[in-house]
A protein has these predicted regions:
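N-terminal hydrophobic/helix-forming segments and targeting peptides
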Residues: 1-253
Length: 254
C-alpha cells in the first residue's frame, strides 16, 4: 500500500499454476536432439500469462483479488510496484524401489539452507562462540543484489557483533575472523550412471553416501588442506561417512 507518507510491503503467494513457458513442439524443431536446445532469453523465455482479450486480467487485478481474499481489501491505485519471483508449483515427491530418491525443485541449495538452519536452532547455547549462518539469494544472477553474497550486510553485522563488547577496539573483528572456521555449504554432483564419463574416475560420490568435500584444481571451491582435515575430523567425531569430489581437469565446475 502507498500514500504520501510511506509505502508498505506485503508478501503475496498466489500458490497456483499461473504462468508457463511452453517449448516448441518437436514437429517444428526436428533437429533439437542432434543440434541441442538453443534458447534466446528475449524471444523464447517469455512466460504465457493468458489469452489476449479486449479486457485482459492484469497482475494488479490478481493481487487485488488475493489481498481481498485475505481480508485486506486494496484499491488498484494503492499497488504501486512489485518484485516478482516465479517458482515451480509442482510439489516434491519421492521415488525409487525403496523410496530413496527425492525429486523437488530448488534442492540446490535449499537443502543446505534447511540443514544449516536446523543445526543452528539445535546447537547448545554458549557464550564462548558466536554461531552464524548466512543464507544468500540471487546466486544464479550474479549475487550482487542487496541480499546477495556480494552485499556488505553480513560483514557489517559481524563487525557490530565483534565490537559489541568494546566499540573502541578496532581489531576485534579481525581477531574474531582469524579464530573462526567457515564452511561453504553447497550441493555436490553424485555420479550419473548415464554420464559417468563426466566425472573424475577416482572421485565419484554416490547419493546417500555422506557429505562431500569438493576440490577444484582452479581453486573454485573453498576447500584447502587444513579445512578438509578439520571437516574430516568432525565427520569422524559423529561417525558420518565422508566422500570426496574432484572436478575433471578438462571440465569447468558449477
Amino acid at each position: 500500500a502507498h500514500d504520501r507518507a510511506f509505502s508498505r510491503g506485503v508478501l503475496v503467494d498466489l500458490a497456483r499454476p499461473l504462468l508457463r513457458i511452453p517449448n516448441l513442439a518437436i514437429h517444428l524443431n526436428r533437429n533439437v536432439n542432434s543440434d541441442g536446445l538453443v534458447l534466446n532469453a528475449q524471444s523464447h523465455l517469455a512466460p504465457i500469462f493468458g489469452l489476449a482479450t479486449e479486457e485482459p486480467e492484469s497482475l494488479r487485478d490478481l493481487l487485488v483479488d488475493e489481498l481481498a481474499a485475505r481480508g485486506a481489501p486494496t484499491r488498484h491505485e494503492d499497488i504501486v510496484s512489485w518484485d516478482l519471483s516465479l517458482y515451480d508449483v509442482q510439489g516434491a515427491t519421492v521415488s525409487g524401489a525403496s523410496s530413496e530418491f527425492i525429486h523437488s525443485a530448488r534442492l540446490d541449495n535449499l537443502a543446505s539452507c534447511f540443514a544449516a538452519t536446523q543445526a543452528l536452532a539445535r546447537a547448545p547455547q554458549t557464550h564462548a562462540t558466536t554461531r552464524v549462518i548466512a543464507l544468500y539469494d540471487h546466486e544464479e544472477v550474479g549475487s550482487r543484489s542487496a541480499q546477495g553474497a556480494y552485499s556488505p550486510f553480513l560483514r557489517q553485522v559481524l563487525e557490530r557483533i565483534a565490537q559489541a563488547g568494546d566499540a573502541l577496539d578496532a581489531e576485534a573483528f579481525a581477531r574474531a575472523i582469524s579464530r573462526s572456521f567457515l564452511i561453504s555449504a553447497d550441493m555436490a554432483h553424485a555420479i550419473h550412471p548415464n554420464y559417468a564419463d563426466r566425472h573424475e574416475p577416482n572421485h565419484a560420490p554416490v547419493l546417500g553416501g555422506g557429505p562431500v568435500l569438493k576440490t577444484n584444481v582452479n581453486q573454485a571451491y573453498a576447500t584447502d588442506g587444513e579445512g578438509a582435515a578439520r571437516f574430516a575430523a568432525l565427520c569422524r567425531d559423529v561417525d558420518v561417512p565422508l566422500q570426496h569430489f574432484v572436478v575433471r581437469s578438462d571440465l569447468p565446475c558449477g
